[in-house]
Amino acid sequence: MNKCIPMIINGMIQDFDNYAYKEVKLNNDNRVKLSVITESSVSKTLNIKDRINLNLNQIVNFLYTVGQRWKSEEYNRRRTYIRELKTYLGYSDEMARLEANWIAMLLCSKSALYDIVNYDLGSIHVLDEWLPRGDCYVKAQPKGVSVHLLAGNVPLSGVTSILRAILTKNECIIKTSSSDPFTANALVSSFIDVNADHPITKSMSVMYWPHDEDMTLSQRIMNHADVVIAWGGDEAIKWAVKYSPPHVDILKFGPKKSLSIIEAPKDIEAAAMGVAHDICFYDQQACFSTQDVYYIGDNLPLFLNELEKQLDRYAKILPKGSNSFDEKAAFTLTEKESLFAGYEVRKGDKQAWLIVVSPTNSFGNQPLSRSVYVHQVSDIKEIIPFVNKNRTQTVSIYPWEASLKYRDKLARSGVERIVESGMNNIFRVGGAHDSLSPLQYLVRFVSHERPFNYTTKDVAVEIEQTRYLEEDKFLVFVP
């Protein structure tokens, strides 16, 4: 099955150019034809004149209106998106519907949208008006043009990236991934459905270019960026750094790994349920997905038995996506290598999941796709060497009380997020993302400083600098 995906420029869906596209093979030999940038499309994109001259309330209300469309299971755009995820990306029906549900949740959570701005920027008003702060007035201005280099493994990361830029009133040039050319296109198309003439809609462009071909046109787009948001693996991040202008900030959301810690659980079922969720969500394609479980205490066999049950449960309520021949082969190879090494191996029907019980210092291949290594340890000290700065994103812990004991040690070792088991995909409002408060990198804080006759806490006289120099009285005013 072939599908043509046009680009969107300044909120307008472009006619598909039969002379400028790249054909990409996706799941089960299904193919898509992706429009690629041309001299004409780049010129149109860079001639954008519209700015998001709206207050935060208007922005949030527009996003909420779009979200209400996504909330309806009868919305045609939502139904098409679910079908595309299943047909072309190999998602199970449950996984695809959950993805659409999460898009609705992100757009409709008005309180969370306000709180994201409040906690990252310090106030929900700083984008709209000058606020008194110390001896100044301060206002946050959008950087301008935000270029989003999206990854294909976690569709919601692209949605999050775009929403952050919209909340901070930045225009968006969105470069989709060939492994998920659908999500950004569907989101921006839903903006068009609601109001094609809305300033937010008209500030959106969605396009594609290959990384391994002539960079002349893509370099023009990158040169136009005021801020770059890069998602993906090492090569994607290196590309972003290489082709971004030297003066712009690059928000790098690169490859990370995550793990779970289970300490002497009284409720074995709850512990195993949380770990199973953290393994199964996105089939371990996300940075926050658990790949290793460290079990502190006794009764490991009981935990493993329950983890089997919970993984079987998730195989029913959230079936994994389809795997290619190579992915299935990697899964089988990991199983055989682990058995040859003498490790305990448990597996689900039809490669639904894989558990390998191994020592902490022995790591085999990681085929992902719901495969996990379980290591029994006696103390947190045995786990700390595997928590690495800039590489370990999320540590999920059960019971929650154990996280209070270990969070300082984990933080010093470099972890970026600590959550309760079963919560790795929920990024709580107010938290950091990969050690950053991302919205701060999407704005310029402008300060309007008070005049000379404004007295400060430490200097209760007018700041007459010329007079102080003439009379050599500077030290008189030093507190």
From Swiss-Prot:
Its EC number is 1.2.1.50. GO terms for molecular function: acyl-CoA dehydrogenase activity; long-chain-fatty-acyl-CoA reductase activity. Transmembrane segments: none annotated. Keywords: Luminescence, NADP, Oxidoreductase. It catalyses: a long-chain fatty aldehyde + NADP(+) + CoA = a long-chain fatty acyl-CoA + NADPH + H(+). Pfam families: LuxC (PF05893). The keyword Phosphoprotein does not apply. InterPro entries: Ald_DH/histidinol_DH, Ald_DH_C, Ald_DH_N, CoA_reduct_LuxC. GO terms for biological process: bioluminescence. It comes from the Bacteria. The keyword Secreted does not apply. Pathway: Lipid metabolism; fatty acid reduction for biolumincescence. Belongs to the LuxC family. LuxC is the fatty acid reductase enzyme responsible for synthesis of the aldehyde substrate for the luminescent reaction catalyzed by luciferase. This is Long-chain acyl-protein thioester reductase. It comes from Aliivibrio fischeri. The lineage of its organism: Bacteria, Pseudomonadati, Pseudomonadota, Gammaproteobacteria, Vibrionales. The gene is luxC.
